[in-house]
Amino acid sequence: TTIATVHDALSHNVNERVDFDDVFSSVLRMAAVVASPTGQVSTVLEGSFGVVDADTAQALATVLAELVTNAVEHGLDGRDGRVTVKACRDEDRLEVHVMDDGAGLAPDTLMTGLGTRIVTTLVRGELRGVIDWEPLSGGGTDVVIHARLHQRAARAEA
């Protein structure tokens, strides 16, 4: 599970910080496989998350696993496709895009499901950020997260 993956990474590190790129590569593969029992889904990670603290790692892994799962289950809806996660890190700022090449959002789609509410709460609370769902011009959806990382994690990068 996502939580077990983060805990495993933290167990090898006494300072409670973890290279999230290593953690997330496992989470990304697991989420896509579990969500897509029928279609072939390729997953791509672009950019780098860098080192984050334990609390950030747990919240970020949970949010991203949910977003990748939703992209596969709802965006791709059983067909073959691609989910790309792009991370852009600048000291204590993190921008993440979770993009799929699926059907995209209908113009009147309300993002009110339980998973969406949990993700939004984690992004606003734990990650001190904002999240938006945007349609991609060629089809698909781009979920964009802007987060502020804890200073301790940002200093670990320096």
Predicted regions and their residues:
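Glycine-rich nucleotide-binding loop
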Residues: 82, 104, 136-144
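ATP phosphate-binding glycine-rich loop and adjacent ATP-lid/helix-beta elements
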Residues: 107-133
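C-terminal end segment of the histidine kinase catalytic
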Residues: 145-158
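Short beta-to-alpha transition helix within the HATPase_c
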Residues: 1-5, 9, 16-34
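Acidic ATP/Mg2+-coordinating residue in the GHKL
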Residues: 100
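Conserved short strand/loop->alpha-helix "switch" segment adjacent to the catalytic nucleotide/phosphoryl-transfer site
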Residues: 18, 33-68, 72-82
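A short coil/beta-turn micro-motif at the C-terminal edge
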Residues: 89-91, 136-139, 149-151
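Short beta-strand/loop element within the Bergerat-fold HATPase_c
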Residues: 80-92
